[in-house]
A protein has these predicted regions:
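Helix-start (N-cap) detector for alpha-helical repeat units in TPR-like alpha-solenoids
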Residues: 20, 54-55, 88-89, 122-123, ...
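Position-specific recognition of the canonical hydrophobic site in helix A of tetratricopeptide repeat
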Residues: 31, 58, 65, 92, ...
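Alpha-helical segment of the N-proximal tetratricopeptide repeat
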Residues: 18-55, 59-66
């Protein structure tokens, strides 16, 4: 490349990048306004220009997940993870989608990967607790909720879930004592 070609390429790259940021912002606004179809079209336009755009893949996945298209959301997260395997946001979102699809063991694998990278991820701890609870591992679930609360004592999801799991354990113990 000549010096002028390099400068032109650089300027074009900045223009395209700015345009993509604007499109992603518009897609987010569409989602907030409930215009899901327009948001998805914008994400697809961005991905046509930049197939490896992690933000577009993630936000598209979240949008699909929010309208109940869990398998498509997981596909979007998988594409993002193939590009950036340790992206915490993508791993958390994929875990939540797998949880919604009742694939609790696979969800836990996502949360465990987050926790390997960030031991103090309150969201990963609480979400893992939810998946453990769904599998009937209430003691382990409570342990994860408590750990999340030890990091952030105001984390509502962990607090409410811990109380619910403890109530379930009490009711199970009560039922067992009645049958004995």
């Amino acid at each position: 490349l000549t010096k002028n070609q390099f400068i032109i390429e650089k300027k074009l790259s900045v223009i395209v990048s700015d345009k993509i940021d604007v499109m992603l912002g518009q897609a987010f606004e569409c989602t907030e306004d409930g215009d899901i179809s327009a948001a998805l079209k914008l994400y697809d336009l961005v991905l046509k220009k930049e197939p490896s755009n992690i933000r577009a893949l993630t936000d598209k996945g979240v949008t699909l997940q929010n309208i109940g298209k869990i398998k498509l959301a997981i596909n979007s997260y998988n594409k993002a993870l193939s590009i950036s395997p340790d992206n915490l946001d993508v791993l958390l979102n994929k875990g939540a989608a797998l949880h919604s699809d009742e694939q609790y063991q696979d969800a836990i694998k996502c949360y465990d990967k987050v926790l390997l990278i960030d031991k103090k991820s309150t969201m990963a701890l609480a979400y893992k607790g939810l998946s453990l609870g769904e599998l009937g591992h209430l003691h382990d679930a409570i342990k994860h909720f408590k750990k999340a609360l030890s990091i952030d004592k105001y984390y509502d999801l962990a607090n409410i879930s811990k109380e619910l799991a403890q109530d379930l354990l009490k009711s199970i113990k009560k039922e067992k004592s009645k049958t004995q």
